[in-house]
């Protein structure tokens, strides 16, 4: 600033440089006086470039460094198959492969000299014993539990439509059955410790609400979730600030309060009571298969 003042005496237009230099000077002064980031304190202004590069580093790796086969958990080749199938375009790549066919773990399918027709009904599993009046023929591969709220509206819709197209089941997650789950795909209704979608005002199991939802044609099986998979022995919580009116309605919880998933169930406390609870759910659902997830 002092230098600009001296130059101004000789050449007044130098004041225009303050339009550019002024903000940089202020940023530099703030960097030198702050106490949170040592990089900015030691390298005022230019130190911000480090954080900018850190911000865009995933994109740099994806577009300039990562090869078609080196990405994790899904490399570019695998992602491309998903993109192409979602657009209903050809997903095959002819003229050889870029993979190392001699690498450990490489998988392939050998040609058969006597190929046979594969009946899709033979690669399904019948779920439900003699006590089930409505057993379910389940696919070997299905969509695991992911609730609406953890996933977006469009994601849930896409998954359920995919379940319908592929003739496999879609697990709702413990967040209950949302309108976005009801796109025609078979459902496995997961019930957690919060009994979302079938609970009383004080968070206990509500048989009437359960019966109303479980008897829907789209619901094929019910899964009891015994505890939080990511933190067994502990509960979960959805802060009131993140609770929307739609999610509150779907989960049958009041607005303005934290939504708790307790560490354990209140409908049963012993293995024998669990078996009795399973019997109760089977009867309320009209004889559909009931299982539990450890």
Briefly describe each language-model feature range.
Residues 161, 177, 181-183, 202-294:
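Alpha/beta enzyme core
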Residues 1-169, 175-185, 189-190, 194-230, ...:
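Conserved, well-structured core domains of diverse proteins
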Residues 171-172, 282:
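Short amphipathic alpha-helical segments with coiled-coil-like heptad repeat character
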